[in-house]
Amino acid sequence: MSEQKKIKVTLVKSLIGTKAPHRACVRGLGLRRMHHTVEVLDTPENRGMITKVAYLVKCEA
């Protein structure tokens, strides 16, 4: 089987002053602190979370 594609997501802006649902999306992606990078699977669910908090994160394919 072929491996699923992954996206590297980095938190580049602080969560202070953001709305609770946006903080929940960042936590759902597995990001804990500034400049923390994680690799998530390229699924519609993860893409939706990334789109919702696009102003807080940087992504690379």
Curated annotation (Swiss-Prot):
GO terms for molecular function: structural constituent of ribosome. GO terms for biological process: translation. This is Large ribosomal subunit protein uL30. It comes from Thiobacillus denitrificans (strain ATCC 25259 / T1). HAMAP family: Ribosomal_uL30_B. The keyword Ribosomal protein applies. It comes from the Bacteria. The keyword Ribosomal protein applies. InterPro entries: Ribo_uL30_ferredoxin-like_sf (IPR036919), Ribosomal_uL30_bac-type (IPR005996), Ribosomal_uL30_ferredoxin-like (IPR016082). Part of the 50S ribosomal subunit. Belongs to the universal ribosomal protein uL30 family. GO terms for cellular component: cytosolic large ribosomal subunit. Keywords: Ribonucleoprotein, Ribosomal protein. CDD domains: Ribosomal_L30 (cd01658).
